[in-house]
Every structure is written in structure tokens, then in C-alpha cells.
Amino acid sequence: MFKCWSVVLVLGFIFLESEGRPTKEGGYGLKSYQPLMRLRHKQEKNQESSRVKGFMIQDGPFGSCENKYCGLGRHCVTSRETGQAECACMDLCKRHYKPVCGSDGEFYENHCEVHRAACLKKQKITIVHNEDCFFKGDKCKTTEYSKMKNMLLDLQNQKYIMQENENPNGDDISRKKLLVDQMFKYFDADSNGLVDINELTQVIKQEELGKDLFDCTLYVLLKYDDFNADKHLALEEFYRAFQVIQLSLPEDQKLSITAATVGQSAVLSCAIQGTLRPPIIWKRNNIILNNLDLEDINDFGDDGSLYITKVTTTHVGNYTCYADGYEQVYQTHIFQVNVPPVIRVYPESQAREPGVTASLRCHAEGIPKPQLGWLKNGIDITPKLSKQLTLQANGSEVHISNVRYEDTGAYTCIAKNEAGVDEDISSLFVEDSARKTLANILWREEGLGIGNMFYVFYEDGIKVIQPIECEFQRHIKPSEKLLGFQDEVCPKAEGDEVQRCVWASAVNVKDKFIYVAQPTLDRVLIVDVQSQKVVQAVSTDPVPVKLHYDKSHDQVWVLSWGTLEKTSPTLQVITLASGNVPHHTIHTQPVGKQFDRVDDFFIPTTTLIITHMRFGFILHKDEAALQKIDLETMSYIKTINLKDYKCVPQSLAYTHLGGYYFIGCKPDSTGAVSPQVMVDGVTDSVIGFNSDVTGTPYVSPDGHYLVSINDVKGLVRVQYITIRGEIQEAFDIYTNLHISDLAFQPSFTEAHQYNIYGSSSTQTDVLFVELSSGKVKMIKSLKEPLKAEEWPWNRKNRQIQDSGLFGQYLMTPSKDSLFILDGRLNKLNCEITEVEKGNTVIWVGDA
């Protein structure tokens, strides 16, 4: 090759001497030494040979290109019009990649392209010896740049397969890192740990990448990813360019436990670190939180922290964080919410004669479970414990046998946990009842007075029953008139020989009023507890069947069917329910402008530590969805779709420990029942199935026990929910009782524990289960219940009613009797006969 160039060089000098200068058409102001410049720039061979041939061959036709030299970037063409030889800009240059910058600031793939551009632009363009133009211009768009990098990875992958005869092992991220490491090693020709522009040029030549990179070149790597602008690419910058993100999470921080007190704010920080760490994504119950518009979780911060503005017990649970796109490296945060103790004592005061037994009980709720202690007149009673003075049920009860005058005092129960302290006083007076003293004024035999009574609504009116001695305190007859009105409690219906009452649902409103539905009279009666009289009738839509008292907003919700066939059900609300004012109903906002689809509704009940509920749900007939409602505005908020789980909701229960809703589903057309579906109250998202647990869910007042009744399988399943919202495996109880209703009662032997009582829809027994141990017992011989067809208002044809936080009695009706159970002794206390269809029972009182 060098010999050929030498011949041309010599000939160039010879003919310049003999022929003189080239014509002016040869280029823009070309000098006599232009051939030397041309040869140094390696002018395209066809153009060079044409010029040499034109000088050497003297006898060719004057107008042909044989004798015409056009200069760099141009070539000779014969005009179709004149037939004369003319110079024109070259159509294309031979493919050859040696990039240069032109004085016009543009990037050119080789010298020929510079001269061709000078011809086309009719301007002088020289070579500029720097690389600034390599990084200018916008031909290489972001999308094209990404495509180029993907293509480079594909090429490297193919190389690896050819060299190793196998695919790279590991996950996508590990494989990508391996390929980028190998690519960098190949690019870094001098192995100095840096890739410069010359090495990129060398790769372009070796791999012939000049025209195949989507309007991009390898130089764009320096333009976009030279992080420190030193015109070199280090391995870390290569990682950045190809998004090989190396994340780190210390082993001891993979699991983080955070506790906050209810009502405060909380910040969960993600410990995942790494250069170019992508944005942090947070999940709860596998639902991404970043994309949700949540009131209480609405700021993720520049550092990716999760910020909870006002902590509640619904926020309890596990949160995971990871860098976007790198979910395999994640940190788990166990978030626990502590709640200060709330105490109730019973009784607040009592008087006892010397020689009898006195009991002072304390119930405390909080998270974690509070520790209990007692003071007498400000002094710890622990050193004074004896056979006569004992602590029972894990310290929740002070038991004094054979009381003496010196036992008189103020007994203070103190509850403590990590979040705070609470206390309350129970006063004991010991003296002769015949003496007219303060103690005599405060005298209150347990079970006497207007409180601590069962109210039973049956065919012959309303009976008020004291459970200890099973005594009637009051009988409100059907013919009794409403206080101040002429209306009767149960007017005689046409065709009836005997004046009878028909009742459905009833609710206790702050131990002040009882609201009770009369479905055949299209109204709700209000019973005043103080006077034990019916004081008002509130008209409703036809056939009111279900009432619920929303204590948070002091309103009673009323579900009416419209007809006995449930053809036009509606929801109404009675506001200011505990007020001494005339009451009336207002309609809720229809969901989808349709009232006639309402099948049921659910509003969680408040507890000692959870005193406010904001939301409820409406269930539509045969619809696999929940309609969320705002209890304050009584308006629709959103729909939670359950179609993916093929669940038409039939029953709901709620625990504040994590804010979970448990949904019992209706059987399908074949009678099969799908497992319960769980919904997260924080995100309103479906979490999934509650394992394989089926049936009607019930949750204990403290939120810790979920009891599910599957009547088809005769199965009772008990699950425990921890203070961290973890749902533990169930234990099973098989029974053929066909459970109708369930009641929870605080344990008399263990603090912070509950027992359940289940009534039977077909049999004469009641099921007892000690939830902490799984101990089971039957209380027998309670007579047959009402037949299901005799109680059309709901599925609970045999109700069972507890007697409050400290009460030891429960009541359950049979077809024509009432049975009072003693929960402390786990036995039947008494039977009250001649009470027909008394399946609406309410407890009023402290205990």
C-alpha cells in the first residue's frame, strides 16, 4: 500500500511542474500543493485516481471527466443538458469511521464527510482538533440512547454466550452487572480503570458501530454519564450509565421495629443505600402506598421516608421499602402503635355490712396490655394481702371476704404501660345498713335501680328484668300509651283477636334510651330508661328491620325493606339520638342513585380505646362489592371491588389492630362458600383471603380474637390477632349446634381475656369457649328456639345478649321462655316462662 501512495506522490510533483496550477473549479481557493493535502487526508481512491488519470492522459476528449479535477468533497459528473463535465458535491462518502469535529461545530464520521458538508453548505469547514462537538446536537434522544445501551448489552450477552458456551447465571440484576463488568474491561484497553474517547473510538472501529446505534454514538456515554466531567468513564460511571445499581442494606437493619404512640406523628426511614439509588417505594400488605392519595400517609420526603401524620391503631402492621425496580432488596418495618391505658372500675361505690364479701373490679385496655396495681387510700395494698384480702384474675379484682369496718376506703386501680398511666377509684363503705350515713345514701345493692337490667321485647310488650334474682321490674303492656300521646305501644291489628307486638331490632343509646324497630307498624319506638316508659314513635320507611347506634356521631341507622319481600330497601338515619328532642329520620345519599339495592350495612362498634369510627359500608344485593360511606356526611365515598375473589359479602367484622375488615361471603349457586376476604382499612385495598377460614366473622371487643362460624361445616375457628396486627393460625372447634348468635364476655379468671357463648338456631344447648385455652363446655337444657321462619328479620332466630363490661349474666330466649346464664359460674341461673317470641333483648347498665 505504501508503494502505491509513493507512486502517486511522485507523479503529483511531476505533473504539477509540467501542467501548472489546477483550474479554479478544483475547490474553494485550493493552492498548488493541494494534491499533497489530498493525499495526507486519504482522499477517496476513485476521486484521486480520476485526477491522476486526467493529468496523465492527454488525448482524451476535452469535455469528459477524464481531464477534470473537482477537489475535496466534490466529484465530476457529465451534465445531461450540456454534455459537459461539471463538479458536484459528492452523493456519499465511502463508509469509514474516524470521527472529527468540523469548524462549524458539527460532528462528522470522517474527513470526507467534512469536505462533502463544506461543498453542500458552500462554506469553508476545517478540522477542529477537540471533541466538543461529539457531545453537541440532539440527534441522540433519550429513548434512542436507552436503545443503544440495550443493544450494547445484547451484543455483550451474545459475546458471553459464544465465549462461555452458556447463558450468564443469576438473576437479571446479577447478570446485568456481569455483562457491564465485561464490557468495561473490553472498553478499557489500557486497563487503567478509565475509558477515554480514544478507547471509545477504538471500540467503534473494531465493532463497526458507526451506523448501528440509533442516531447515537458511544461518545454519548461521555456526554450523559461522565458524572465528574473528567472526560473519562470509571466503572462506577459505567454502572450508572447502564443502571447497574449496587444497593446495600446492613444485615442488622433488614428488620426494623418502630413504636409510636397513638395521636402522634411517625417517620419510617428506609435504610437501603447506594449510589444513584432509585426512588424508594413503600408497600403495606403488598399494596404500593406511593401512588395512593391517603390522608394520613401523604408525604414520602426527599429521602424516601414514610411519614404518618396522625398515628392510629389501624396503621399497625408491616411496611416494606425498596428502591424502585429492585424489589429483591427490601427492608421490613414492623410498626407498632402504643395506646395509653383506659380504665373502668366496678362498682364506683358500694356499701357492705360487716361480715359479708366485697369485690372491686378493674378493667383496663391499652397497647401493650397494661399492668394493674391497687392502692387503698393512696397506699399499695400488696404488703397487706392475706387470706381475707386477695387479688384475683391477674390483679384485676380485689376480693375481700368477711369485710370489717377498717376495710372502708378508696381503692384506686392503676394501669400502666409504655404509653402512659390511668387510674380510677372504687369506694367501699362498711357499716350497719340501719345507720343513716353517707354510706346509706350511696347504698346500691348490685342489680337494683334503673340500671343493670335486661329489656326484653316480646309479643306481650316489654319486660324489664333484674338478672340476679330473675325478677320483673316493669312490664310495659301493648296497650300502654306513649308518654304524652294517645298512640299505644302496640296497636291492635285488624283481624287479631289479641293485641300483640311485633319487634325486630333494638339498640341501647348511652344507657339513656332504647330504640326498637316495629316492622309491621313502619316506625321506631324510643324507650326512656329513667322513666321506663315509651316516649316517642319515629316514622320510618316501610318495614324497618335493623338498627345500629353509631356512638361516634350519636345517630341511629335504620335499614327498612320497603316490603316483606325486600323489594325497595332504604337506609335512614336518626340524628341526635341521645338528645331530649323530637326525632325524625333522614335518608342517606343513594349509591348510584338507587335505594332498592341495599341489602345490609356495617358500622364498626367503638371500644374503650377506640372511641371514634368514621366510615361504614353498605352491602348491595348480589353485588361482589362494598360501598364505603362517610358516617358524618352520610354520603358515598368509593366502591371496593370483590369480583376477583367471587365474594358477595354477607357479613363483616372489624379489628382496630391493623384496621382489617373480615368479610364473610354468601354461598354460590352450588352452595360452596369461598374463604373470608380481608380488606385493609388504611388503603381500602383487598389483601386477599383469610387463609381457608370461612363463615360469619365476629371480633372480640379488644380486637384480639377473630371467631368465625361456618354453619354448613359445623365449624368454629378461632384466630388471635397480635398488637402488631399479625393474624395467627386458627384452632378449630367442631359442633353440630348450628350457631345462631355469639356473645363475648370478659374472663373472670384472667385479665385481658375473653370467653364466648354461642346460641343454637336448632338445639337446646349453648356453647361456651374459653378463648385463651380453647376449653369448651356445653350449657344444656335451654328449650327449643323460635323456628327460623317465625323470625324473618335476620338469621339470628335465637339471640344471646351479654351484660356489659363487668356483667356476669347473659340472656337467651327460647320459643316461649327466657334463660339467664351465670357466666362466672358457667351455668344456668334461671328460666323465666311465658315470654313468647322474646328474641329482641337489650342490656342497660354499668355491669
From Swiss-Prot:
Disulfide bonds join 89-119, 93-112, 101-133, 270-321, 362-413. Residues 175-210, 211-246 form the EF-hand domain. Residues 83-135 form the Kazal-like domain. Residues 250-337, 341-426 form the Ig-like domain. Changing residue 92 to I: In a colorectal cancer sample; somatic mutation. Coiled coil: none annotated. Ca(2+) 2 binds at residues 226, 228, 230, 232, 237. InterPro entries: EF-hand-dom_pair, EF_Hand_1_Ca_BS, EF_hand_dom, Ig-like_dom, Ig-like_dom_sf, Ig-like_fold, Ig_sub, Ig_sub2. One of its GO terms (cellular component) is extracellular region. PROSITE patterns: EF_HAND_1, EF_HAND_2, IG_LIKE, KAZAL_2. The keyword Transferase does not apply. It comes from the Eukaryota. SUPFAM superfamilies: 3-carboxy-cis,cis-mucoante lactonizing enzyme, EF-hand, Immunoglobulin, Kazal-type serine protease inhibitors. One of its GO terms (biological process) is cell differentiation. SMART domains: IG, IGc2, KAZAL. It is found in: Secreted. Pfam families: Ig_3, Kazal_2. Ca(2+) 1 binds at residues 188, 190, 192, 199. One of its GO terms (molecular function) is calcium ion binding. Residues 1-20 form the signal peptide. This is Follistatin-related protein 5.
